[in-house]
């Protein structure tokens, strides 16, 4: 190794504590900024190039660097995303935070070869701008450049598998294996694209559902987890809950109503309109049940599940579900229990004389 390379190694040794601290701090800061941007990433990894690795690099091309600050990959950070679309979003965050050395940054996605799936990473060479952070005692913090690689989980897995198999190592491998690896690369790229496409379509579907719910076109909205969550945001059971609470001037305690979704599906409701029709047609019956159940008590706190449960009770009784139907309802809402059978029998017996059962 020549004298110049040895001097660069000496500079590396003196800066190693700074490299190590930056490699720890920057990823943690990035995670915070990703959270603020609403970006969910799979992982943020980091490493500091070892002296042995740097020595090997200098042995090959030490004359390329006039100072240690010309070496841009001593600190390496890798941001692994779940979706292709998020790679560019991560890049946007980096562009806001750091000075990007565009001359040395590389978008390997634009150099697309038939077998290059795992190597489609976006690589930015970054530096901390003085306007964001500076320390007169450590001016090197604003001189050190570091590399940030951005890729998806599948691209990362592919790159690691290639490394393990020796593929891309410069050693010729039999064409049959090369062909199979290329086929796998294509399959993984399709999977990556499909994940992103499905996410975009789901986002579009959710926006459409929210618009339909807000406009009141509930009969056009299929009943599923997404649509039910949107439906609950308009608080469809509040009016009946307030009516029931007025029986005892009770306070309403909000509880999670998501467990009613499988019950509504078991009742063969297929759209949000089916739930809305139940509210319209059975609110009076549900109130009669509530008057009977709590009218003679001193309950002053009622769960917000009171209205939907009484609606389901009235619906099941009026449609001939009887004791079996009510037990299934209670099992779905509260979990299977022998006490549910007794409660179902009690509800059937006590409800038979209520006005709605005789109309």
Model-derived features: positions:
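Charge-rich, low-complexity segments
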Residues: 1-74, 81, 85, 211-214, ...
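An acidic, glycine-/histidine-flanked metal-binding catalytic module
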Residues: 2-12, 16-18, 22, 142-286, ...
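Sparse, context-dependent recognition of short Cys/His-centered cofactor- or disulfide-binding micro-motifs
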Residues: 11, 15, 19, 29, ...
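Short, charged low-complexity intrinsically disordered segments located at boundaries
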Residues: 55-64, 120-128, 216-228
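Long beta-strand-rich cores associated with HINT superfamily self-processing modules
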Residues: 68, 80-197
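Amphipathic, soluble alpha/beta structural segments
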Residues: 113-137, 176-209, 288-334
């Amino acid at each position: 190794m020549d004298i110049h390379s040895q001097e660069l190694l000496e500079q590396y040794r003196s800066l190693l504590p700074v490299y190590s601290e930056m490699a720890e701090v920057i990823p943690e800061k990035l995670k915070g900024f990703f959270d603020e941007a609403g970006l969910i990433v799979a992982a943020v990894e980091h490493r500091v190039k070892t002296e042995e690795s740097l020595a090997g690099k200098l042995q090959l091309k030490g004359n390329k660097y006039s100072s240690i600050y010309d070496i841009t990959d001593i600190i390496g950070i890798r941001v692994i995303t779940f979706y292709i679309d998020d790679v560019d979003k991560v890049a946007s965050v980096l562009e806001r935070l750091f000075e990007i050395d565009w001359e040395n940054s590389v978008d390997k996605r634009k150099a697309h070869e038939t077998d290059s799936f795992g190597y489609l990473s976006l690589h930015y060479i970054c530096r901390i701008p003085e306007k964001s952070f500076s320390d007169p005692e450590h001016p090197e913090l604003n001189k050190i450049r570091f590399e940030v690689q951005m890729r998806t989980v599948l691209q990362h897995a592919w790159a690691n598998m290639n490394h393990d198999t020796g593929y891309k190592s410069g050693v010729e491998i039999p064409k049959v294996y090369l062909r199979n690896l290329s086929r796998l690369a294509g399959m993984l790229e399709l999977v990556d694209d499909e994940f992103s496409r499905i996410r975009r379509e789901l986002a579009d579907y959710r926006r459409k559902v929210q618009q339909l719910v807000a406009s009141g076109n509930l009969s056009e909205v299929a009943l599923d987890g997404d649509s039910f969550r949107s439906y609950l945001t308009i608080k469809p059971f509040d009016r009946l809950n307030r009516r029931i609470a007025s029986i005892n001037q009770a306070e309403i305690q909000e509880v999670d109503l998501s467990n009613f979704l499988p019950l509504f599906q078991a009742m063969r409701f297929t759209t949000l309109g089916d739930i809305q029709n139940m509210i319209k047609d059975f609110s009076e019956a549900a109130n009669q049940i509530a008057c009977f159940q709590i009218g003679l008590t001193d309950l002053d706190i009622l769960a917000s599940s009171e209205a939907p449960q009484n609606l389901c009770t009235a619906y099941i009784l009026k449609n001939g579900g009887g004791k079996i139907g009510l037990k299934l309802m209670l099992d779905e809402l509260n979990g299977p229990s022998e006490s549910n059978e007794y409660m179902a029998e009690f509800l059937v017996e006590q409800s038979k004389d209520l006005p709605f059962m005789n109309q």
